[in-house]
Amino acid sequence: MAFPAWSWSWSLKVALPSRSKSFAAFSLSFSGHHIIPPVSTTPILNRPSQSYRRIHCTPLRQQQQPLKMPSATTPPPSPSPEYRVLIVGGSYGGLCAALTLLDLSHGKVARFNFTENAQPPARQIPMQITVVDERDGFYHLIGSPQALASEEYASKTWTKFADIPALQSPSVRFVQGSVSSVDCQTKIAQILDTETQETRKEKYDFLIASSGLRRGFPTVPQSLRREEFLSETRTNVDAIRHAQDGVVVIGGGAVGVEIATELRTLYPTQKITLIHSRDRLLSAEPLPTDFQDRVASVVRDSGVKLILGQRVISTATIETEGGRKIWHLTLTNGRSIYAGHVMNAVSKSVPTSSYLPQEALDQEGYVPILPSTQFPPTVPNATQHFAIGDLASWSAIKRCGGAMHMAYHAASNAHQLMLSADKPEYITLEKSPPCMGLALGKTAVTYTADQGTRDGESEHELWFGKDMGYSICWNYMKLGEPWKA
């Protein structure tokens, strides 16, 4: 996981707990990579820019200059009582977009704007911000490896939207449900409400798509309500504790290595085995081999048994005479592995973009955004549609830090259109190099283009703090500060 750090030239380096995200150090990545602001009690605005560069890995520059607008556009409706903004997805990106709009609409400098001497908007603009999410709250995805192995920590990682002080504003409402379709021409979305099980039409003036990727367990919990999530965690923790024949983690990507080392840290007497089909861990990531090798070394040193170059071709359960269940795994070389519990961290993440029109997507289902985070110009009303986070096709490893940075851009640019549809002053993204931080037990292995591969407990403290980046993200978004108009 890794997190976002920003330095003004607008060079935002994102290193959130990778899990990117990816994560998981402000790997605001997933699967294990995230990017987050540095751990410090000093307000980020008062810190020297040098401290930002130290931990930021994604140079994304914010440019205050006009950007050519896509041709396929219709000016947003002007004198309406208030602008209607629909945000699809309430994770890192979605919440940052909502908070940015909330600040700007009330004539405040956005909380994510670290420009020196930044000026507030010239006037307030009434808005109604609707956030639609399948879950009933914000889940700290970066913390999944620990949350699914610790009931105490799990309780901290999921906060119902109704319990987040910063979002308790009349201008913001949350709908637990899913968006089934979006008509960009008419600006109407179809929303299936989880509570009523009814589909309703939602008209909007601006849309920000931040629904991310569909990921399986154990990358993310499958529960949609906090109470169900805690029950899901309890079940997994019980299985780990009672696995007399050890625990096997399948898949050596970011999620797999973080889960394996976290289990070893939390349950030091438990036998933990990590199986990966390739000869190197993190084989799917665009990272140097010295980073992959360093991760493998740390994993082994933690006490995890590492099996590389072997694929699990079959799994079967065996019932013992005492009623105990044992897993039998067969590898490609014919070797048999037995375990009391198996966690499969091999799953292909799929974009949750089925609700968007085909002309807005590439062949893999991602939105090929412009540097302004807007939809491609072939889409009707493209300038009023934005995509951020994992759903967007953009450079760099996907992580939460990048999603938060993109959210600030999308919300700011939407606000610019509200201020002046004819001459908006967009801020734009720049391509960024690969960056990742992995929380491996009490240590972390990180990679940035400027510092290369690093590891150690100090790196863990810098990228993840003491709670897998939870406090870093929570405080960065200022979620605990009650909203004041």
Predicted regions and their residues:
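Eukaryotic N-terminal targeting leaders
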Residues: M1-R84, H106-P126, G322, P482-A485
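C-terminal, flexible cofactor-proximal segment of oxidoreductases
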Residues: A72, P81, G177, I397-G402, ...
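Glycine-rich active-site loop/strand segments that organize a redox cofactor
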Residues: A122-S155, A209-A239, Y447-T448
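FAD-binding core/adjacent interface of flavoenzyme oxidoreductases
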Residues: I44, Q50-P59, Q65-L86, Q168-V248
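Rossmann-like NAD(P)H-binding beta-loop-alpha module
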Residues: A243-K271
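Beta1-alpha1 glycine-rich phosphate/pyrophosphate-binding loop at the start
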Residues: L67-V175, T261-L287
